[in-house]
């Protein structure tokens, strides 16, 4: 993917942002609007979508109330986008939810829901849009939102960590699959703590059984740590500035929180140190 021109790659191009009703998705949408992109906002939360739209700089835009974890719903949304803007040039597969719990204690129904939202929605986005991006012969980019939890692990975060690791693996494979294409870039976004309401599930309209969520102390502690941490986290607007710069530079890894670099390095070194155990 070397050789992609560093021109004004954003203005008048179409950006689809899932999970746009709040948090990171809202930050990406506001930044895209400032760049005078055609901005498509997609989420289950209709009120949040309207609020995001009201905060945006005036630009060509559309709101689609959609469950991206449902392929039929997502496919219908694609038809609406095509009729209004044509090709999606920048695909932000950003929708996601948080669910804590130990690996053997998370309820099966809740497991399926977080897999559907955090992983299958990304897969559906790729299924629906990558072929037309390649065929367009225009500068395009795919950004899949993972997390620091897509690289490192902690206790009692099995559902979230599993899905976010899967997004990293999927995106790395996608990057390899498109390695010979000099038009379509690929990035995986792995942020640390950001000012979002991901820990607050009530507003999402999701069919989650709260009573079956793991009540072990470690699960509660991690959920509380995250709830406290996001209050002081990076602003979505600052994160979006980093993301768009990384896209412009065609960088695969988008790691927005330097305080986690040492943790990433320790994790990589642990893997490297144990390779000799296979001899």
Please describe what each predicted stretch is.
Residues 3-39:
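Canonical Rossmann dinucleotide-binding motif of NAD(H)/NADP(H)-dependent dehydrogenases/reductases
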Residues 35-51:
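Conserved glycine-rich Rossmann-like NAD(P)H-binding loop of the short-chain dehydrogenase/reductase
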Residues 46-47, 65-76, 108:
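The beta1-alpha1 cofactor-binding region of Rossmann-like NAD(H)/NADP(H)-dependent oxidoreductases
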Residues 102-103, 107-115:
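Substrate-binding pocket helix/loop in short-chain dehydrogenase/reductase
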Residues 126, 163:
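Active-site helix of classical SDR
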Residues 147:
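Residue(s) in the substrate-gating loop at a strand-loop-helix junction
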Residues 179-253:
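SDR active-site lid
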């Amino acid at each position: 993917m070397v050789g992609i021109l560093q021109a004004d790659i954003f203005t008048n191009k179409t950006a689809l942002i899932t999970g746009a009703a709040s948090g990171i998705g809202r930050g990406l949408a506001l930044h895209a609007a400032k760049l005078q992109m055609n901005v498509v906002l997609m989420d289950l939360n209709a009120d949040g979508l309207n609020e995001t739209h009201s905060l945006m700089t005036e630009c060509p835009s559309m709101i689609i109330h959609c469950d991206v974890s449902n392929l039929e719903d997502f496919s219908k949304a694609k038809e609406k986008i095509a009729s209004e803007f044509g090709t999606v040039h920048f695909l932000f597969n950003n929708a996601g939810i948080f669910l804590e719990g130990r690996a053997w204690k998370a309820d099966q129904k809740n497991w399926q829901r977080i897999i559907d939202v955090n992983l299958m929605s990304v897969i559906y986005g790729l299924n629906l849009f990558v072929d037309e991006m390649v065929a367009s012969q225009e500068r395009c980019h795919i950004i899949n939102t993972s997390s620091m939890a897509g690289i490192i692990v902690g206790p009692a975060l099995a559902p979230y960590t599993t899905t976010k690791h899967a997004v990293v693996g999927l995106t790395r494979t996608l990057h390899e699959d498109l390695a010979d294409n000099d038009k379509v870039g690929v990035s995986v976004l792995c942020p640390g703590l950001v000012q979002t309401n991901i820990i607050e599930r009530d507003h999402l309209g999701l069919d989650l059984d709260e009573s079956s969520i793991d009540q072990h102390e470690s699960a509660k502690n991690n959920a509380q740590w995250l709830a406290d941490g996001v209050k002081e986290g990076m602003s979505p607007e600052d994160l979006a500035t980093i993301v768009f710069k990384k896209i412009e530079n065609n960088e695969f890894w988008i790691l927005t929180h330097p305080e986690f670099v040492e943790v990433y390095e320790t994790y990589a070194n642990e893997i490297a140190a144990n390779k000799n155990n296979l001899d």
